[in-house]
Curated annotation (Swiss-Prot):
E.C. numbers: 3.6.4.13
Residues found modified as Omega-N-methylarginine: R12
CDD domains xrefs: DEADc_DDX42, SF2_C_DEAD
Organism: Homo sapiens (Human)
Tissue specificity annotation: Expressed in several cell lines (at protein level). Expressed in liver, lung, tonsil, thymus, muscle and pancreatic islets.
Protein name: ATP-dependent RNA helicase DDX42
N6-acetyllysine: residues bearing it: K5
Biased composition (Gly residues): 1-18
Chain spans, region Disordered: 1-114, 182-203, 737-938
Region described as Necessary for interaction with TP53BP2: 738-833
Helicase C-terminal domain mapped to chain residues: 487-632
Coiled-coil blocks: 116-157
Length: 938
């Protein structure tokens, strides 16, 4: 073959000078071995050094395209490069001056020849090996006759399968690999999580000094207390509820049974709730009692509100967050959509107490979430992974958390969040209150509940998670081991008469000993333990199923998975190693709808297991004997973690809570500082930042809630007076005092905590009529009407008949008569007003309005010609803050009333009032400054 094509005496490499394989020839040109000898030696492992560069074949040049030996097998064709566009490097001729300069370059020059040569040596070595492999394949293919290349060659699909066989992990991200895949009901694998977040490191709670907190706020309503046991069963049956656990609270059937205060009830009514859902009827009393709960209900059953409402009350009892504090309540849910939904509910109900909520979930801005957490929020709604990220980055901490909720726990387990959920629970203080909600109650959820809940109450709504109540558990407490043998021999014949008996022992040696002893007593029985051959075990199980042997003595390992419906009695001769094993043991009976009995024999040394057994019995709605409970109480950890019974804490006694916000309605009877009014929390708690921080917004919210909560139609006020709080307070639709009959008015004004005075005292700068005390009276509904109604209220209290006349006179003379009435109110009730200012400490709460009850300051504020100030005094006159001052005001007005004739001219009354203002009224009050002449004087 001519290798010198293209020019005389010039050696050319492959791929140059027209070398091609003609398609028509039968004999394909073979690649002779000696044709590679020219460069085969140079392509040894020693590489191509600087000593012999001319021997480099042209297709091994840097950046050049390798030769295409076979068009059908373009093995080394590089499709990304085009040989026509590649600039080949310049290599000077041998013995040329340029070549000599190239060799004479110093070693430490800036050129990068050394790394390049090392790399090229490796590339050329690999290329030489590939060339040899290609030649061998060509030889093998040429030697085989009658084989079609198009069939034998590897196509795309075969290449893909070969590649996947060689690289089983190709394309699989390492984080997505899961050893244990979960499968859904159809048998399809559930996709694992996209990202595994390392759980939080373990924490030693004994080194942290946690402040105590209160969990129990539930006081049972008398209607629920009076229910008989049968009525209670009927109520739960009507609500389709099944409740199990130690001493569960009775369910309520209306919102009145929960004892919520007016702020929260206002938001509940606003959310269009008419009555609680079944899960709320039982779940809210459980959560208010401070008990741990497992709630099993379908989506849409109202379980979200069932843990949000008690959460708000739980938070309100604790002290306010300080800078750097973490949340008080944490709600963990599986998906960001559910997280946003629960966050919206928390915001809706939390604004009743100005509580802040933050949603923390994957996919949201990490920086914004961290900023919101650092500003402080009482409630955090989160997904597990993102909360762990924030805790690791010190954006928040879990030290203040005392209310922990896991919503849709089964979905979190399906998504692979088990370790994260457990690490979050382990980072929260051990004496927390934990609520677990799930749509199903699989074994994993049951195990989690046992690990993170203490004495939980299980509330099942609907037909989900049907508890197996076919097994009756009986616990026998015996003095010693021999007592067990006596008990067994005495009762075994009785048990075998009703069906097959399965005896459990813990160890193999004990099983053999017990079986031998029973055989000596004449009992026909079988033995089953882990060291037996499979054939022997199969024969024993077969005989037991056929009822050839009525008694079977077995260990735990051998008995797992036994499904024999004829077993009527299970006897735990030795207690199980743990409660899981115990559950498996007793599950051997009561199968396929058959009833069964499980006996457990305990001795005094089994106190550790007794605690677990008590909780297992309570969870299965089984009777717990006093002897068993006493034995369990000998165990220190059970005694310490056991729930405490008793009545719930009555809130608002002596203040307390976030910013000492008053909480009327939760059993509050006597209050030292708080005032029983709906709006008091707006006054007491103002966040430093946020929408509710400024006073104008607080006043708007106060007015809105005041009008909506205390609306009473004017025509119905006389009928409802004294029968309801709103009627007794005499509020009209405008928020001002209404004219009420004598008895009810006197009763309302003499009671220590009248809703009128309390509602008026709720907001700084508000008088009894619902107006701002320092503002001019320009609204007829809240100003003039308030004055007229107040006057008529005074007349009705004094017992005179001048009510109609006065109201008529004030209504006709809107100008001067209003002014004179303000002076009269000042004259009549200076004394009680000054006493109130010192006693009730309004100045303590709001220094800017502390002198609202001082006479001099009030007169000094007559920027509007004295009108506003005097009307404010009139309001102050009616606002007797306690029993004494009201009586003083009442007596004083009774004495002064004969001097006030209904038809006195307003100008004369003005003069009289101006004189009486200057007289001493028994208090060391500074002389009021001279009043400027106002337009009312004319």
């Amino acid at each position: 073959m001519n290798w010198n094509k293209g020019g005389p005496g010039t050696k050319r490499g492959f791929g140059f000078g027209g070398f091609a394989i003609s398609a028509g020839k039968k004999e394909e040109p073979k690649l002779p071995q000696q044709s590679h000898s020219a460069f085969g030696a140079t392509s040894s492992s020693s590489g191509f050094g600087k000593s012999a560069p001319p021997q480099l074949p042209s297709f091994y040049k840097i950046g050049s395209k390798r030769a295409n030996f076979d068009e059908e097998n373009a093995y080394f064709e590089d499709e990304e490069e085009d040989s026509s566009n590649v600039d080949l490097p310049y290599i000077p001729a041998e013995n040329s001056p340029t070549r000599q300069q190239f060799h004479s370059k110093p070693v430490d020059s800036d050129s990068d020849d050394d790394p390049l040569e090392a790399f090229m040596a490796e590339v050329e070595d690999q290329a030489a090996r590939d060339m040899k492999r290609l030649e061998e394949k060509d030889k093998e293919r040429k030697n085989v006759k009658g084989i079609r290349d198009d069939i034998e060659e590897e196509d795309d699909q075969e290449a893909y399968f070969r590649y996947m066989a060689e690289n089983p992990t190709a394309g699989v991200v390492q984080e997505e690999e899961e050893d244990n895949l979960e499968y859904d009901s159809d048998g399809n694998p559930i996709a694992p999580t996209k990202k595994i977040i390392d759980p939080l490191p373990p924490i030693d709670h004994s080194e942290i000094d946690y402040p105590p907190f209160e969990k129990n706020f539930y006081n049972e309503h008398e209607e629920i207390t009076n229910l008989t046991p049968q009525q209670l069963i009927d109520l739960r049956h009507k609500l389709n509820l099944r409740v199990s656990g130690a001493a569960p609270p009775r369910p309520g059937s209306s919102f009145a049974h929960f004892g919520f205060d007016e702020q929260l009830m206002h938001q509940i009514r606003k959310s269009e709730y008419t009555q609680p859902t079944p899960i709320q009827c039982q779940g809210v009393p459980v959560a208010l009692s401070g008990r741990d709960m497992i709630g099993i209900a379908k989506t849409g059953s109202g379980k979200t509100a069932a843990f949000i409402w008690p959460m708000l009350i739980h938070i309100m009892d604790q002290k306010e967050l300080e800078p750097g504090d973490g949340p008080i309540a944490v709600i963990v849910c599986p998906t960001r959509e559910l997280c946003q939904q629960i966050h919206a509910e928390c915001k809706r109900f939390g604004k009743a107490y100005n509580l802040r909520s933050v949603a923390v979930y994957g996919g949201g801005s990490m920086w914004e979430q961290a900023k919101a957490l650092q500003e402080g929020a009482e409630i955090v709604v989160c997904t597990p992974g993102r909360l762990i990220d924030h805790v690791k980055k010190k954006a928040t901490n879990l030290q203040r958390v005392s209310y922990l909720v896991f919503d849709e726990a089964d979905r979190m387990f399906d998504m692979g969040f088990e370790y994260q959920v457990r690490s979050i629970a382990s980072h929260v203080r051990p004496d927390r209150q934990t609520l677990l909600f799930s749509a199903t109650f699989r074994k994993k959820i049951e195990k989690l509940a046992r690990d993170i809940l203490i004495d939980p109450i299980r509330v099942v709504q609907g037909d989900i998670g049907e508890a197996n109540e076919d097994v009756t558990q009986i616990v026998e407490i015996l003095h010693s081991g021999p007592s067990k043998w006596n008990w067994l021999t005495r009762r075994l014949v009785e048990f075998t008469s009703s069906g097959s008996v399965l005896l459990f022992v813990t160890k193999k040696a004990n099983a053999e000993e017990l079986a031998n002893n029973l055989k000596q007593e004449g009992h026909n029985l079988g033995l089953l333990h882990g060291d037996m051959d499979q054939s022997e075990r199969n024969k024993v199980i077969s005989d037991f199923k056929k009822k050839d042997i009525p008694v079977l003595v077995a260990t735990d390992v051998a008995a797992r998975g036994l499904d024999i419906p004829s077993i009527k009695t299970v006897i735990n001769y030795d207690v199980a190693r743990d409660i899981d094993t115990h559950t498996h043991r007793i599950g051997r009976t009561g199968r396929a709808g058959e009833k069964g009995v499980a006996y457990t024999l305990l001795t005094p040394k089994d106190s550790n297991f007794a605690g677990d057994l008590v909780r297992n019995l309570e969870g299965a709605n089984q009777h717990v004997s006093k002897e068993l409970l006493d034995l369990a109480m000998q165990n220190a950890w059970f005694r310490k973690s056991r729930f405490k019974g008793g009545k719930g804490k009555k809130l608002n006694i002596g203040g307390g809570g976030l910013g000492y916000r008053e909480r009327p309605g939760l059993g509050s009877e006597n209050m030292d500082r708080g005032n029983n009014n709906v709006m008091s929390n707006y006054e007491a708690y103002k966040p430093s930042t946020g929408a509710m921080g400024d006073r104008l917004t607080a006043m708007k919210a106060a007015f809105q809630s005041q009008y909506k909560s205390h609306f009473v139609a004017a025509s119905l006020s006389n009928q409802k007076a004294g029968s309801s709080a709103a009627g007794a307070s005499g509020w009209t639709s405008a928020g001002s005092l209404n004219s009420v009959p004598t008895n009810s008015a006197q009763q309302g004004h003499n009671s220590p905590d009248s809703p009128v005075t309390s509602a008026a005292k709720g907001i700084p700068g508000f008088g009894n009529t619902g107006n701002i005390s320092g503002a001019p009276v320009t609204y007829p509904s809240a100003g003039a009407q308030g004055v007229n109604n107040t006057a008529s209220g005074n007349n009705s209290r004094e017992g005179t008949g001048g009510s109609n006349g006065k109201r008529e006179r004030y209504t006709e003379n809107r100008g001067s008569s209003r002014h004179s009435h303000g002076e009269t109110g000042n004259r009549h009730s200076d004394s009680p007003r000054h006493g109130d200012g010192g006693r009730h400490g309004d100045g303590y709460r709001h220094p800017e309005s502390s002198s609202r009850h001082t006479d001099g300051h009030r007169h000094g504020e007559n920027r509007h010609g004295g009108s506003a100030g005097r009307h404010g005094e009139n309001r102050g006159a009616n606002d007797g803050r306690n029993g004494e001052s009201r009586k003083e005001a009442f007596n004083r007005e009774s004495k002064m009333e004969p001097k006030m004739e209904p038809k006195v001219d307003s100008s004369k009354m003005d003069k009289v009032d101006s004189k009486t203002d200057k007289t001493a009224d028994g208090f060391a009050v500074p002389e009021p400054p001279k009043r400027k002449k106002s337009r009312w004087d004319s």
